[in-house]
Amino acid sequence: MNVFTLSWHYAWSKPLSAVLNVLVLALGLGSLAVILMAHQRVQQALERDVAGIDVVVGAKGSPLQLILAGVYHLDVPPGNIALADVEALRRHPQVAQLIPISLGDNVNGFRIVGTTPAYPALYGGTLASGQWWQAPMQAVLGADVAKTTGLRVGDRFAGLHGLGAGGHAHGDQPYVVSGVMAASQSVLDRLVLTGIESVWVVHETDMATDADDLAALQAEREITLALIRYSTPLAAVTFPRHVNAATNMQAAAPAYELSRLLRMLSAGAMCCVRWAWRWWGWPHSACSWRCGRPCA
């Protein structure tokens, strides 16, 4: 009598126990599959949003915080940097492209991002309706923003101060929706894009008490950060060092910070995979999880 015959007789002699064992096994395998698939989707989304960005320059602080705020829009930025300093970097011979980013307001929790048309082009953004902004206080909505807020081309809305819901509204400087972007499965879907001048107009008008204050604010304009693409691969070695040592800004490499972030996100999934390999006694050679360590 072989093992299959014994298993068959056992299952028929104790059907409830057999069903429960199969159910537990199915739940375990299903949970493991869900964890691995979710991790893979998160990793793909993170890698897609960082594509085309060699370095992010912003205020000194945590490099990971700068990447989370400037690339993924999941954190608060360390601070602002002077526009004059950014323009000096734009003229640097190792900089092929510099995209300014200004944050500070939101609508229904979705961030309003002041930038240039090069930013949506970075992710291959296209319009589902309307047109790109042509003047200050015109805004283009991401697909998720339009779906959640119900705003359409021609509608007006006021930005709320801060990067989360609950700030005071800039009711005297409303935005006009000029376009709605098509879904791109990128960070663009959950952003409101406008000209960088719009962010300056809103906050300078809100802060200035007279013409002298307004002129002073305009002379000392700032942005939140800059996304930079190198003109040569060699810049990856020298440019961040130059920014970190010779300026009051910091340069953070998205590729390096992304690897750190993925290591943190992988901790739970790796534990589940290693437990499964150990539980079922599968050899390490059968493990497709690239952890670099034995699974048992």
Regions flagged by a language model, labelled:
Residues A169-P174, V180-A269:
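Mechanotransmission and gating elements of multispan inner-membrane complexes involved in transport
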